[in-house]
Amino acid sequence: MTAHEQISAAIRAAAGEGRTALVAFITAGYPDKARFRETLAEVAGAADVVEIGVPFTDPMADGLTIQRASRGAIAQGVTLRWILDELAAMAPPPAAPVVLMSYLNPLLALGYERLAERAIESGVAGFIVPDLPLDESGPLDAALAARGLALIHLVSPVTPPARLEAAGRASRGFLYAVNVTGITGGAKAAGADLNEYLGRVVAASRVPVCAGFGVRSAAQVADLGRVVPGVIVGSALVESLERGESPAAFLGGLATP
């Protein structure tokens, strides 16, 4: 099974158990760089997939919480290379598939071929690149696909139908359905409009769909889980870590029966 297939399988396994898969986002090295491996291990033990944010100086898709986390991680010296080194050194490796969410510049600086090689060495299963347009993703996609790694595309309520279909065909691992039109951590779309949008995304995708941006409660997870197999939790988990709470306990409180 390739790395991107492992991501899809983890999400489908949750559905097979009658629950909504949780994709848990943390910013690497935040709030405490020294406890990164410990935090990651605990999160991976409670989530189905872990999304690790690579800190960036201009995180344009992120809300205040993740911007703050990104600044805090950068202040502690966290870089893409440091993250890959830490992941490679983890023993045992995380219990759930790991994907990196990174803006494009750090990936370009490392180089796509070297990035893909380092990902394999570090146990990274795939990447989410929010500022990489689908029609410009070919070179990165080729480097990742050659090694069985995921390139996870994002769609939103304003994605045109043709682009939605293209993203549904191209995405590996899962398809990221942004359920707000703004930045992370904001209020989600509601009711029939949200369900109609997510239904269109599911129909267009050949891989599992995970909905994210603005998910903060077990009720939201349950509501979204009626339409999509997976839900992404980011800002709320980062804020829980800032409060010194157990990430496993927080994620357990969001889990569906």
Enumerate the predicted regions with their spans.
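Active-site-adjacent beta->alpha loops and helix N-cap segments on the catalytic face
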Residues: 2-14, 33-34, 56-68, 75-90, ...
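N-terminal glycine-rich anion-binding loops that anchor highly charged ligand groups
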Residues: 14-21, 45-60
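A structural motif corresponding to the C-terminal end of an alpha-helix
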Residues: 17, 46, 83-98, 122, ...
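Hydrophobic faces of well-ordered beta-strands that scaffold small-molecule active sites
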Residues: 22-26, 50-52, 98-102, 127-129, ...
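Conserved, mostly hydrophobic/aromatic
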Residues: 24, 43, 50-53, 119, ...
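Glycine-rich beta-to-alpha transition loops that act as phosphate-gripper elements at the mouths
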Residues: 27-32, 101-109, 133-134, 154-159, ...
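Catalytic cores of alpha/beta
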Residues: 33-44, 159-169, 204, 211, ...
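Glycine-rich phosphate-binding active-site loops on the catalytic face of alpha/beta enzymes
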Residues: 49-58, 122-128, 132-136, 176-185, ...
